[in-house]
Amino acid sequence: DNGWAFTFSGALNTGDGYIRGTNYEGWTYFGNISKKINDSHKLSLTAFGAPQWHNQRATKHYIEDYKNSPDGGRYSNGYGCLNGALTGAGYGYNYYHKPQVSLNHYWTINANSSLTTSAYASLARGGGRRVAGNKTNWLTIDYNTGRPQAGAMLTPDGLFDYDAVLKANAESEHGSQVAFTNVVNSHDWYGLLSS
């Protein structure tokens, strides 16, 4: 009405994943507000993005690990429970969000000519979990074998024992011996296009 148009949508996708310990959450959103100023000029503001996080399985395992596991091909040992939630260990978690926003101007100069101009921005933030400290072996999988590092703190069923790690960190005379960190990938893109 009065030359205005509005469109908005969004969705949430969440689940446990096919592989054990690979739970995930992903949102998507889209929004557009457009205005027809007159027969020669239109403006359109658009924003969209898809923030997500996911746990992931270690990249390598021996075939016998799959065969010997009751989970078969769904087998994973690179996670544990932290505060009641499945939590991937070092190299077992990623997150990312790269929203994009653009303001477009459409100008019909005459019957034979037009000019479209777009100003845009994209502000990306994301990263992946790592472990740091003197005892990283408590919470890491050996990249070559897919098995926990020697000295890893595990529950009786072979998952990472975060409670034991928290207890050992709290009791250490030298502060925390291992901690989760994130390797971050961020960038800001801006631009102006006209054709």
Residue map of PLM features:
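Acidic/polar loop-and-plug regions of large Gram-negative outer-membrane beta-barrel proteins
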Residues: S34, K42-Y106, S118, R129-S194
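Transmembrane beta-barrel wall of Gram-negative outer-membrane proteins
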Residues: D1-T14, I19-R57, V101-N110
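Generic hydrophobic alpha-helical segments
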Residues: G15, N112, A124, S176-A179
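Membrane-embedded beta-barrel scaffold of Gram-negative outer-membrane proteins
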Residues: S114-Y120
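Membrane-spanning beta-strands of outer-membrane beta-barrel proteins
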Residues: Y24-G26, Y96-K98, A124
